[in-house]
């Protein structure tokens, strides 16, 4: 019974559902009514539509067109497998090419790494800042670099890294720059070049205007430039150091210790108008142990005031290690021997004096040129010195160029004052310079065993002498168009024994730099001078 009741109940429910479905089909917008209850819907109307299915006459049958379906592109890969056997020679060749390419790549990479490492390890140089000296006391330290270096070498100890001469030394670096002092506002008064170390020293002088030369606010300026270069002209060189002296007029600059190229110290002796001499030193020192190596240029100056008159001559007489000596002379006739290392006095000042008049009374009948010159000098208490020369071939004598134009051969090793000799120790030429002698320099002629002496003067002439024979060995003196300030020997030119020539360089007061060629004539046994530039 209960089963029948359940079936009846289900039939009733099914019938109600069918009736509700019929009512819902009469209202198509009933689905949206729940979302828009306020919206008013129009009544549904029935529309009949007829569709023709028969084909009209004369119409063409159109073929059905297939719909275009867009398909995704599919990428496929073909894998080929070689089944033939590869020849052994071709395989070996391919392996060789691969190995060669790999080695080349590794070599190139190694070279690039080494190059980068070498550039990073390249030593660097730090120059000292320009220095200005305004006081009379110009000494920086009494412990000179040259003395310290010599003591280390004499003790037998190994020199420290800052004293060793290696490939990174200042003297051997290739440096290019153009930093020379401008010559427009300065006058070049001294120039010295050391080819062994490739160092050029140039001294410039700047004077106040003529209308202000006595003003208290104006003073003379001297500028010393030290240049690393490959030639004496100073072109394409690097300015290593520069020192300015305010109120000091430097007369000469001489490079000392030339015969010690292994030294790491540059020694320069500066002579001033007031008689002060300055030992100006430069050395290279490693800053600190680091990579890359950094070198610093250090400067030192030792000043001494031994003279009361202008210093006009500086001659190095000994180049023995730890015994380097230099002769320094003032224009009033004082001569002193000093150490090149620290300017220590090795021989007290000696005064050059003329022959006493009492000794000349016995020579009244002697009318030679030298005796007449001695008689004129006897009126004074001293002999003015303009220049000086020295040669190791005759070490006991020193040659003096006088302000009166004479050339005097003086015996150096004598106590007390230095007196001129009555016979000038064998040097009595028939002719001599008429005015101040500005330069003397020796040269040894190996071919003819001659000791040649080159001299120049403000009388516009350059002369050549045989120092041992005491006579001139030129047909006529070389006459230039102005006063000559300095002359020095250049390299030799050997073109055979009879055609051998010598060269010298001459500086004139008008700024000209002249090169003179001296050719020996075997017939006359004389030298002939020719200006070649």
Curated annotation (Swiss-Prot):
Ranges for the region named Disordered are: 1-36
Single Gene Ontology BP annotation: establishment of mitotic spindle localization
The UniProt keywords, alphabetically, are:
Cytoplasm, Cytoskeleton, Microtubule, Repeat, WD repeat
Gene Ontology CC terms, in alphabetical order: cytoplasm; cytoplasmic dynein complex; cytoplasmic microtubule
Which organism encodes this protein? Answer: Saccharomyces cerevisiae (strain ATCC 204508 / S288c) (Baker's yeast)
Stretches forming WD repeats: 380-422, 432-475
Q: Where is the composition biased (Basic and acidic residues)?
A: 1-19
**What protein name applies here?**
WD repeat-containing protein PAC11
Q: What binding partners and quaternary form does the record give?
A: Interacts with NUM1, when DYN1 is present.
Identify the main location: cytoplasm
């Amino acid at each position: 019974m209960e089963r029948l009741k359940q079936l009846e109940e289900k039939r009733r429910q099914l019938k109600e559902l069918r009736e509700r479905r019929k009512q819902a089909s009469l209202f198509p917008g009933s689905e949206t009514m729940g979302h828009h209850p306020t919206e008013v819907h129009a009544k549904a109307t029935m529309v009949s539509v007829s569709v023709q299915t028969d084909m009209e006459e004369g119409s063409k049958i159109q073929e059905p067109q297939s719909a275009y379906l867009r398909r995704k592109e599919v990428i496929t890969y073909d894998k080929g497998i070689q089944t033939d056997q590869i020849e052994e020679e071709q395989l070996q060749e391919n392996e060789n090419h691969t190995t060669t390419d790999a080695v080349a790549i590794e070599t190139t990479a190694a070279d690039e790494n080494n190059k980068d490492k070498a550039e990073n390890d390249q030593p660097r140089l730090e120059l000292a800042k320009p220095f200005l000296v305004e006081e009379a006391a110009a000494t920086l330290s009494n412990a000179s670099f040259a003395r310290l270096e010599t003591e280390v070498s004499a003790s037998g100890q190994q020199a420290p890294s800052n004293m060793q001469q290696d490939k990174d030394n200042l003297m051997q670096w290739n440096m290019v720059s153009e930093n020379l002092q401008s010559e427009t506002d300065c006058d070049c008064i001294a120039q010295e070049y050391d080819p062994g170390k490739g160092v050029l020293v140039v001294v410039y002088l700047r004077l106040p205007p003529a209308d202000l030369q006595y003003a208290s606010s104006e003073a003379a300026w001297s500028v010393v430039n030290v240049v690393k270069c490959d030639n004496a002209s100073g072109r394409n060189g690097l300015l290593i150091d520069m020192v300015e002296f305010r109120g000091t007029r430097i007369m000469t600059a001489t490079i000392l210790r030339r015969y010690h190229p292994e030294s790491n110290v540059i020694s320069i002796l500066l002579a001033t108008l007031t008689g002060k001499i300055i030992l100006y030193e430069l050395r290279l020192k490693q800053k600190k142990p680091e990579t890359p190596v950094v070198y610093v240029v250090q400067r030192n100056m030792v000043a001494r005031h031994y003279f009361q008159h202008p210093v006009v001559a500086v001659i190095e007489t000994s180049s023995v290690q730890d015994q380097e000596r230099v002769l320094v002379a003032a224009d009033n006739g004082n001569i002193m021997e000093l150490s090149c290392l620290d300017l220590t006095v090795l021989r007290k000042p000696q005064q050059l004096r003329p022959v006493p008049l009492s000794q000349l009374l016995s020579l009244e009948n002697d009318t030679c040129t030298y005796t007449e010159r001695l008689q004129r000098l006897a009126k004074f208490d001293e002999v003015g010195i303009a220049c000086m020369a020295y040669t190791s071939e005759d070490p006991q004598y020193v040659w003096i160029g006088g302000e009166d134009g004479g050339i005097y051969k003086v015996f150096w090793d004598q106590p007390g004052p230095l007196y001129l000799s009555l016979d000038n120790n064998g040097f009595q030429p028939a002719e001599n310079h008429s005015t101040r002698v500005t330069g003397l320099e020796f040269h040894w002629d190996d071919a003819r065993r001659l000791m040649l002496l080159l001299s120049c003067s403000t009388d516009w002439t350059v002369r050549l002498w045989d120092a041992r024979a005491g006579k001139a060995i030129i047909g006529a003196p070389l006459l230039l168009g102005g006063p000559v300030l300095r002359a020095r020997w250049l390299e030799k030119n050997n073109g055979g024994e009879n055609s051998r020539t010598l060269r010298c360089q001459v500086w004139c007061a008008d700024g000209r730099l002249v090169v003179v060629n001296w050719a020996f004539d075997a017939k006359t046994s004389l030298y002939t001078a020719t200006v070649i530039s």
